[in-house]
Amino acid sequence: MFWAKEEEENSLMRLLKTDNFTLEDVLLNEFVVQESRYGKAELVQYITSRENMKALLELSLNPKINTDLPMKQQYRLSFIASEILTIRGTDVFQKQIVTTEETRKCLVDFLNDKTPLNHLVAGFFAKIMECLLSRHFDLFQTFSLLQETKFFDKCLRNINLGAIECLLENLVRIPTTSEGTRIVKEWMISENLFEKIVDRMRESETDDEKECLAEVYCEILRELRDKLYIMESKVDELHAKSMDETLIAKIADNLIVEEGCPAEELVKKSALISASAKILEAFIKTNFVSNAPAQQLEEIERNLIEERHYSYGLMRPCMDNDPYEHSYQPDPERIVEGILANRLPNILQTVLRDIEANGSVWQPLLRLIIELCNTNCMSTHEKIAVAFRSLPFINLIKAAKMLPRASVLHCLLVKVVILLLHSSFPCDELSPAAEYLLTEGGLIQNIYDTATSPNPGSSVACSGLRSFNQNLGDAINRAKKAGIPNQKLLAILSADNTWTELEDIIHLYNLKHRPQMQHDFNDSSVVSSIRNDSHGFNDSEEWTDASTKFAEMDATSSAKQAFSGFSSPFEPNMQRFSDFEGQFDDTPDEDEFRKLCSERANSSSCAGISFETSPIKWPGEAEKTSEKASEPPSVVASTYPQQTNGNQAFLEQEEGDGEWVWPTVPPLGETEVVTQTGHRPENNWVDETAPDFSHLDMAPPKEDDMWADFSSFPTISPTAAANSASSSSSDAWPGSDIHLQGEASDWPLNNSHESKASDPVMVGLAASISHPGDSSEA
């Protein structure tokens, strides 16, 4: 047998037994990585020598590239060397790196070097470091080596490389033991990693580096808080270090823009503002808020895929009855919210300036304000109200209405209003910020003025403005109609005469243009995600661009011959758009347009379509066609005839109907005979007696071959069907009349499988063929 044979040596083993070979010859051998994983003694002994280990590490971290070689081969030896040093099946190579003096010096020199890395060497380095940090052979020896180097400085200088960014993000996840995790956290604390990240954000000159630094900070924070939510011990020194008030204040100060700051300086600072806002947003997002407005709007389920940390921060308390888990918060004192709320007036001023200057900073800042509005903290909402008064907030609404196509801006502002209106506090108080918007803030009056004023802009601009204004009104209307509405909110609205008129306008608009709004997942006013803006465009944005293209399209262009297989052109029908009435009557109806765009392509009506090519001629089709033409109209027997006192009942099956009518028994003394061209009887008398399946042996009259349309076939005996098919087309298929040895003429059914009325298999088969709809429902 094959296992009794001696194992043949491969080319690598034969090479190691010779005297004239080099390390390069070994690395270029096709079996070197495979045999290294297997731990071949001869190969391990050769590689783990001091000079070879140093050479492998030098090849991985400081390769000398021959530019004369093709690009594919320049880093070939470096890649193979890094693969050997990071083999998972054994610790022997990694242990040699941290215990051999030559390799230790090589690694220290590399980490202390300030030369920028390229993406390939960064990948080799990240892979080696991950293997070293995940091994348990001697953790203290590994960290004692790293503490002598400028590891974090080296990584932060090359943070723009994806491999380095991932290495820092996963640093607290790499160790496989709790002791290893503790050592890594102590190392990060001693090196002041978070302070270095924030300082590097200010010093960096490229926008990409700022974004990568913010992402590293956020990922480490999410990982720490994920563990805090599920661990019994809620003490984490590294998390406490990240929550240092001085550090948070330094991050928040990056959002401050002086009033006299020129537009050019604001553009230069936009990347720093966006990165800082992203970090503060992660702090607020991962701090659990009981009964948050986003939960009331049923938005959390949609964010489970992208917002991974929510599985512990928000969904876990919903599934766990442990009161301690309900009350735990990583930031119970709301430190981040307080620091940010104190700077909110300046942040709102920056948002307004950036919107008017057509900048990009308003988007991350508004997302940060949205998270601040989703906190259910009275002190925070009081500071929000103060900031709204100082701006005032209605100026943001007016600036957004000056940009009717800015759907993302509209969506974010609507979310701010929604979250404030749905915030819940003890004693059923209304958010001070929401109260300001509904009273002295002038939000209702602004919505009413826009709804009742003509707009001379283009159709697209009018429709975008109309949707934004309508969504603002819907936000107030739905807060009023909530399951448990706020009594103070109801009192404010009932005392406002403008709201009474505006409510009627909102109701009429929704009745005509959004009849199924509660099921419309494209509506940005409520159903669009509070936290996830992957579909941040509102309902108007989904069709206004398309409507513009349709309006500019010449209707005659669609009447051209589109495909040679069709003898007549398409006939577009745009009449349904002319039914729009009311304000902005020159714009198409958004609901009708969306319905039209959602129809399948094959539902378009094309009059007079025919194909010029002939269909495929199947064997036996010509004979069937000639026989069918000479046959007189026949009477079709019922699918399930019943034996009743000598009277035979017949029933019609309508051609193409696809639905079978159960057999009936007429009154005594009557016989009902229905032809194919007759009318279906209105009354059917159902016999409750046991059915008789003796008719299964009867062959039906010949009909056109419906190919695979079994819904219009009568239930007949498989034997009869096989005989009929064989007799009608035996001359068309070669060899059809020749049977194998032992094969009956009705193969695959022989005499022992004749159909009987008592055979349960035939009963089920007949029922499934005659009533496919019933069987599918069952």
Curated annotation (Swiss-Prot):
Cited InterPro entries: SAPS (IPR007587)
Chain residue ranges for the region called Disordered: 609-642, 714-778
Keyword Transferase included in the entry's annotation: no
Effects seen without this gene: RNAi-mediated knockdown causes severe reduction in cortical contractions and lack of pseudocleavage furrow formation in the 1-cell embryo. Positioning of the spindle is abnormal due to reduced pulling forces that prevent oscillatory movements of the posterior spindle pole during anaphase.
Quaternary structure note: Forms a complex composed of catalytic subunit pph-6 and regulatory subunit saps-1; the interaction increases pph-6 and saps-1 protein stability. Interacts with kinase air-1.
Family (UniProt): Belongs to the SAPS family.
Protein name: Serine/threonine-protein phosphatase 6 regulatory subunit
Protein source organism: Caenorhabditis elegans
